[in-house]
Amino acid sequence: MDCHPAGAHYNKDRLTPDSVSRGFISVMKKIRILVTGGTFDKKYDELTGRLFFRETHVPEMLRLGRCRLDVAIETVMMIDSLDLDDDGRARIVQQARTSDETAILVTHGTDTMVQTARALATAGLSAKTIVLTGAMVPYAFGSSDGLFNLGSALSFVQVLPPGVYIAMNGQHFPWDVVRKNTATGFFELVNTP
């Protein structure tokens, strides 16, 4: 999905207001978004009161956020992260590995986000910047943190050095020093010695 206006690409031969911001050149990277489901993409069935998956909300969210980035969206799976096993994580790793893009954003359920981040970080993808994000409240509810988290993660994936990160609530964390605090509903740094 190309969600930036025509002519917004960086042209190394001609600097434009789109390519220069506050004294530095902003080179637009193509970003691969790997969709895996999670609360981020759940819908609510009013008749049964159950949450379920149909299709991703990411294209709509990018449109509402007036995204100007060059992104490719790929649905890898639509699953609750509590149901995600090692085979599912291997699929996510494989999609990241075969992606031509070096900037990869993964939408993911928050319960096992750190485990998937670990799988990506130990898969030999050291030349790529991979950011995982999700939501505590489904986007379909309207009061979701998903749109904010997606926007933050899109910014982080463009500027962070290669590595694997988790981006939630406007913050980013290296994958190996973060945990989800189930009492507060926030991600936080792990106490390290």
Give the positions of each predicted feature:
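Short, flexible coil/linker elements and helix-boundary hinge sites characteristic
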Residues: Y10-K12, G124
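Active-site histidine-anchored catalytic micro-motif
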Residues: M28-P193
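Short, positively charged and aromatic/hydrophobic N-terminal segments
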Residues: H9-Y10, G23-F24
